[in-house]
Design a protein with these regions (language model features):
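Portal/gating segments that form or line small-molecule/metal binding sites
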Residues: 1-120, 130-172
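Feature captures the catalytic ectodomains and active-site-proximal regions of enzymes
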Residues: 127
């Protein structure tokens, strides 16, 4: 998910993958971020550089409700952002029960890890890069329990990237 120092400069950029992965963003009602991803996103998308880099995506992100998980941030400068000091299962269930379309998490491996362990993620959208990092930050940390996934869709690209959509297999 990231190099040993948190770097993501190894990730391949591909306009086709960006287009495919951004299709669901206009139907997203809430974005969730851990503090590191929040800082990165809030430091770019509201700025003139972010708005000119991808005007449609910037408009969606800037106008949509957001939750940032952080024990250190005292206030959120990015409009429409709620800060939560910890991941509270009842609060997540309340957010999921609201009428609407989709809650999307960008990056934020620790949040994905915790929500996965609690069984609160309905779908995983992953972009597989043809890069072996060797060391670094894993998407699923040591707390994640084993889970089976059902493949919903897979798309391959000339760049070598693979876009994957999985649904956790629910026990019957």
């Amino acid at each position: 998910m990231a190099g040993s120092k948190g770097e993501i400069d190894w990730a391949i950029r591909d306009d086709e993958v960006t287009e495919l992965s951004s299709r669901g963003q206009d139907s997203t009602d809430l974005f969730m971020f851990g503090r590191i991803t929040y800082d990165m996103m809030a430091g770019f998308w509201p700025t003139p550089a972010g708005k000119s880099a991808n005007p449609t995506f910037a408009a969606i992100l800037n106008s949509t409700s957001k939750v940032a998980f952080s024990r250190t941030l005292k206030m959120a400068d990015w409009p429409n952002t709620e800060l939560l000091a910890e991941l509270n299962t009842d609060r997540i269930l309340e957010l999921k029960s609201r009428p609407g379309k989709t809650i999307m998490i960008f990056g934020s491996g620790s949040i994905v890890d915790q929500l996965s362990t609690l069984g609160l993620i309905d779908e995983y959208q992953l972009i597989l890069n043809p890069v072996v990092l060797g060391r670094g930050k894993r998407l699923f940390g040591d707390t994640a329990a084993m889970m089976n996934l059902d493949l919903m869709d897979a798309s391959t690209f000339k760049s070598g990237l693979v876009f994957l959509r999985y649904r956790p297999t629910r026990k019957k």
